[in-house]
Amino acid sequence: MFKHKLTNLIAAAAVAITATFSLSHARADELATLKDSGELRVAMSGQYPPFSFTNDQNQVVGFDASIGEAIAERLGVKAKIITTPFDGIIAGLLAKKYDAVVASMTITPEREKAVDFVGPYYHAGRAIVVKADSSIQKLEDLNGKIVGVTLGDAHEKWAKAQGNLTVRSYKGLPEMLVDLDAGRINALVMDSVPVMVAVKETGQKIRILDTPNIEGGRVALGIAIRKNNPELKAKMQKVLEDMLADGAYEKISMKWIGSDIR
């Protein structure tokens, strides 16, 4: 009887060890799979200049695209840029349509329940943008006004939570700026960096409200990957830290933004 119980215990322990090893191996598989495939599929909207947009050669370029390509290169693989609407970008990641999201995504507790983040890879501030000659001077002046936001981003959620704004959602910044200039919206709410870069190119006259205490005034943005991939996360984090340390990140940031936005 004792021998039989001992045999059962040994068998059970073996199963447990095998299961633990299999789980550990499965969690490491994604990094190995990427290296085997030779490709890192990177998702972004393609509608968010200067972070991701389509150039005259029909190529998706920008800060996010360059960061994704640089990370892939240091992982020893090639980057495949995939554009997809931002509001469904996490769902696409979980469905394994791509391997990472480099799309200026704000790190939030809600998103951290669904995905893991590498980074932050830059920081930005929430901006309330109006036309230069607008009568809107402070946050309270937005009461009852129409504001534009990017569909699915953290600023859309913030604007809708205010309860006193009419919120109009857009796929990207260019359409928002056109509607702001035409008076179809009174303001737009989004990260400050892309707005400043965009209007520098278009010559559009805008003003950013002074809102030092606004929620999300300075936020961290990260690279999203699927959960339970500790080796992939650690490797990508190390690659990003190396880029920050050796000047590669600053070079990309200066090219697309004109300043170091880490």
Q: Where is each model-derived feature located?
A:
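Sec/Tat signal peptide C-region and signal peptidase I cleavage site
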Residues: F21-A28
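Extracytoplasmic small-molecule ligand-binding "clamshell" domains
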Residues: D29-S104
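Alpha-to-beta junction loops
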Residues: L40-R41, G76-K78, A95-A103, I146, ...
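Ligand-binding cleft/hinge of the Venus flytrap
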Residues: S52-D56, G68-V77, L139, G152-K171, ...
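Short helix-initiation/N-cap motifs at beta->coil->alpha
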Residues: A65, I81-A91, S134, D153, ...
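Extended ligand-binding regions for polar small-molecule ligands
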Residues: S66-R74, I146, L151-D153, R218-S259
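Periplasmic-binding protein-like
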Residues: H123-V130, S192, M196, K200-E241, ...
